[in-house]
């Protein structure tokens, strides 16, 4: 069966494994967008290390979970977000101002909303985690 949205599948797998209390989760297929999204999550300490396994096909990723993640999800379609509209999306998607991040894809790469605000750039919303 053809996968329509590999990022959505990966984030849902992480979400389900986290709810079940698993220590690791296997994601396949691997893509650059998933790797960048996981890097942002790891930078903020919501997941542990992850390892990319090259099987000469689509690839796999093994993610170590820390138990800190409450929810992660994808926003589809990928809405355009200007810098001034970021506050509105933050209020809609995140539970509070203290924690949680929206992940954007911008011309400067894939980053969280705080880094996008610092770099003064908008982009398209990929997803969120808290």
UniProtKB/Swiss-Prot annotation:
Knockout consequences: Morpholino-injected embryos have a thin yolk sac, bent tail, and show a marked decrease of erythrocyte production.
Listed Pfam families: Ribosomal_S8 (PF00410)
GO cellular component, one term: nucleolus
Keywords per UniProt: Cytoplasm, Nucleus, Ribonucleoprotein, Ribosomal protein
Protein's cellular compartments: Cytoplasm; Nucleus, Nucleolus
Keyword Chloroplast attributed: no
Keyword Cytoplasm attached: yes
GO molecular function: structural constituent of ribosome
Major localization class: cytoplasm
InterPro entries hit by this protein: Ribosomal_uS8, Ribosomal_uS8_CS, Ribosomal_uS8_sf
PANTHER family the record matches: 40S RIBOSOMAL PROTEIN S15A
UniProt cross-references to NCBIfam families, sorted A to Z: PRK04034.1
Function description: Component of the small ribosomal subunit. Part of the small subunit (SSU) processome, first precursor of the small eukaryotic ribosomal subunit. During the assembly of the SSU processome in the nucleolus, many ribosome biogenesis factors, an RNA chaperone and ribosomal proteins associate with the nascent pre-rRNA and work in concert to generate RNA folding, modifications, rearrangements and cleavage as well as targeted degradation of pre-ribosomal RNA by the RNA exosome. Required for erythropoiesis during embryonic development.
Protein name per its UniProtKB record: Small ribosomal subunit protein uS8
Source species of the chain: Danio rerio (Zebrafish)
């Amino acid at each position: 069966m053809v996968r329509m949205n590999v990022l959505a599948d990966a984030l849902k797998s992480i979400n389900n494994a986290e709810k079940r209390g698993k220590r690791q989760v296997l994601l396949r297929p691997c893509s650059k967008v998933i790797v960048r999204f996981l890097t942002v999550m790891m930078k903020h300490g919501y997941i542990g290390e992850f390892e990319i396994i090259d099987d000469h096909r689509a690839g796999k990723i093994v993610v170590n979970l820390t138990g800190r993640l409450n929810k992660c999800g994808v926003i589809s379609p990928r809405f355009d977000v200007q810098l001034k509209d970021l506050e509105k999306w933050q209020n809609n998607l995140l539970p509070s101002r203290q924690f949680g991040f929206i992940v954007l894809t911008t011309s400067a790469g894939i980053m969280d909303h705080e880094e996008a605000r610092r770099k003064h750039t908008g982009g398209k919303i990929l997803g969120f985690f808290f």
